[in-house]
């Protein structure tokens, strides 16, 4: 498996492009860089059966968001308010920031 430079980060707002949750928008909770996947809030939710423990004596069925491949996600631009491709630009002080390819606005806060 190749290591890709992921442009998706935690707390980003993304839109799902394919699959059962196509068109939904959610916030990235966790990025799994080695597997090229991301866990997105309320996307690809699975029902997990938890056995009773001391912390949770009743156990039961819990909804848990599962990882989605990053190729199926697109970052939402705050100024365009649509899913966009992302580029990287280096500022004069040497800092690298993510920019929107359609409006050239900075995505990083």
Curated annotation (Swiss-Prot):
Highest taxon of the lineage: Bacteria
Molecular function GO labels: rRNA binding; structural constituent of ribosome
PROSITE patterns: RIBOSOMAL_L24 (PS01108)
Gene Ontology terms: biological process: translation
Keyword terms: Ribonucleoprotein, Ribosomal protein, RNA-binding, rRNA-binding
SUPFAM superfamilies listed in its UniProt record: Translation proteins SH3-like domain (SSF50104)
A Gene Ontology term for the protein's cellular component: ribosome
InterPro entries, sorted: KOW, Rib_uL2_dom2, Ribosomal_uL24, Ribosomal_uL24_CS, Ribosomal_uL24_KOW, Translation_prot_SH3-like_sf
Keyword RNA-binding (UniProt): yes
Listed CDD domains: KOW_RPL26
Listed NCBIfam families: rplX_bact
Role noted for this protein: One of two assembly initiator proteins, it binds directly to the 5'-end of the 23S rRNA, where it nucleates assembly of the 50S subunit. One of the proteins that surrounds the polypeptide exit tunnel on the outside of the subunit.
Subunit structure: Part of the 50S ribosomal subunit.
Protein family per UniProt: Belongs to the universal ribosomal protein uL24 family.
Protein name in the entry: Large ribosomal subunit protein uL24
Species name: Desulforapulum autotrophicum (strain ATCC 43914 / DSM 3382 / VKM B-1955 / HRM2) (Desulfobacterium autotrophicum)
